[in-house]
Amino acid sequence: MKVLFVTTEMDDFVRVGGLAAVSAALPRALRPWSDVRIMLPGYRDVVEQFTHIEIVGQCAALAEMPACTLGRASTKDGLPVYVLLCPELYDRPGNPYGDESGRDWPDNDIRFGRFASAAAELAAGTLDKNWAADLVHANDWQAALTPAYLAWRQLRIPSILTIHNLAYQGLFPKDSLRRIGAPDSSFHIDGLEFYDKLSFLKGGLVYASHLTTVSATYAKEITTAELGCGLEGLLRVRSAAHQLTGILNGIDESWDPRHCAQLAQPFGAGDWKGKQANADYVRRQFGLAVSRGPIFGLVARLVHQKGVDLVLSAADEIIRDGGQIVVTGSGEPAIEDALVAAHRRVLDRGLAAAGHDDLSAVPDDFVGGRQHEVDALLMHEPRD
């Protein structure tokens, strides 16, 4: 089976949240049974990391979406990656979705409408004349319109949409419908319309052949009024039709601390000297005082939904009792500012921010204040 895995993040190239980890691990896990290929936007960080990108096709302009070029490359271990090359949309500073101050790019409808439209063309075999997909696997709102473009063009290619986080829906003004070349008939309650706005995610929920999410628990939670983010009615319909499945994320063995070259000292279960050596290294790297107390890790996108504010409210008590906290990630400017202020307040005694460094092997425990299950990755990362 030929599978096109459509994503806007992938570890080793560009990362904002857990989507990047899934996008790096799942296609590799599928390789023994399928010809799986990844499609990514041509962000600056992505393009710079490939030594060679072969041009395979051209996308014509559509509505307000510019023409673009499709390139093909491969990872170091031979996984094929298609890159959508359009510098005016993707060659920008900041992160994939916003500028350096954390504000969303105002043309994100164009940026990800262009991406989804091109993915549908690639799946149909009109961009790479030597390859077409038997199945399209789109991820989150940024790629969610891929099944919609397939349907609008009457392309009978089965599609899956995975919901990694229902709270992020890709909402835009109604006028975006025209900007991305979507048919007027799609703007209604059984289409892309969501409280008089256009919802990219809803488009995928409506048009994808099947929906999946990160666990069986989360699949149930998003059909409730409390956690359905206004989409619970549609999700209940898809669930009743057996078209919504929760699949628990599995363990990525590349995180095994016994064989990880990135650690200061590899270690396994019961090897507390090795564990301590890595903890001491992290303390030195981030200016924390030497201690034999526990390190608590917070590995998350720094947004309210992840409970970062609750961790901050407990930080003084944790530090007073001898613990230390290491935070990794980026996110809302207000929360980042609060972390900086907390760090200045306690100086080296117990709180450090570490950007996007992977520190899952170091903490003695993890903290977070999520009130519902939306992170099914961290709990499975092997750390001994």
Regions found by a protein language model. Give the residues of each.
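Generic low-complexity, intrinsically disordered segments
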Residues: G350-A352, Q371, D384
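Alpha-helix boundary/capping motif
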Residues: D357-L359, D365-F366, H372-A376, E381-P382
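Catalytic cores of nucleotide-sugar-dependent glycosyltransferases that transfer UDP/GDP/TDP-activated
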Residues: M1-G355
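A short, highly charged, low-complexity intrinsically disordered segment
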Residues: L347, V362-P363
